[in-house]
Amino acid sequence: MKKIIMIALMAIVTCTAEAQNTLRENGTLTLQPKIGAGFGYLSGKFEMEPGGQRRIRTGIVLGVEGEYYATEWLGIAAGVNYAMQGWKYEIPNVTTVMKLNYINIPLVANFYVVKGFALKTGVQFGFLLTAKQNEDDWKSNAEKFNFAIPVGISYEFNNFVIDARYNFAVSPVNKVRNDDNRWRSDLMQLTLGYKFTL
């Protein structure tokens, strides 16, 4: 009985090991243009007025990402993205829209747990392009640099890649802040890309 269990366990481990690989050989380089939607949200500490609600700001995410396949289960990716971030804040009869547009540089490790599927995490460096509160310029009030931790999952099929990730902002957006007001610009993004082998 013990032998049967051991053989079964070895078979499961072997199958899992074979499944835990990328779709490409070690040492391969790929380039992936991508486009999709971003859903910006205000996180951190924010003094809420009575009846106030934080809302999502929807925008565009587009860019390009290169990936190096280091092992059968690990890819290292670096990219450059344009992202429309920010948020909406609603109180009765009034909506304020914070429009923050960034160039983001993500550095991500892709862990290929099964063929085609990758879990990912890393770091992201954001550089502010424009900032508006409704239609008023707000750039002088905003930090020029944003640091975030992206976490996500992707699936590749016939070179097409669907990527969903959440960028947890670490650094605050507002220059003038205190213990009760430390605004952070989170971003959930869903993109479709196509991988070219170099």
Predicted regions and their residues:
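Repeated loop/turn-to-beta-strand initiation elements of outer-membrane beta-barrel proteins
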Residues: W73-I76, F117-L119, N159-A164
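Short glycine/proline- and aromatic-enriched beta-strand/turn motifs that initiate or cap beta-hairpins
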Residues: Q20-Y68, N167-A169, K195
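Predominantly the C-terminal beta-signal and adjacent terminal strand-loop region
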Residues: W138-L198
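Structural signature of outer-membrane beta-barrel domains
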Residues: G38-L42, A83-W87, G126-T130, N167-S171, ...
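Outer-membrane beta-barrel translocator domains and adjoining extracellular loop/strand segments
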Residues: S43-P50, K88-T95, A131-W138, N174-D179
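Residues that define the transmembrane beta-barrel architecture of outer-membrane proteins
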Residues: G27-L31, G52-I60, K99-I103, E143-I149, ...
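Residues on the lipid-exposed face of transmembrane beta-strands in outer-membrane beta-barrel proteins
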Residues: P33-F39, I60-Y68, V80-Y82, I105-F111, ...
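Outer-membrane beta-barrel channels and translocator barrels
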Residues: N26, Y69-T71, V114, N158-F160, ...
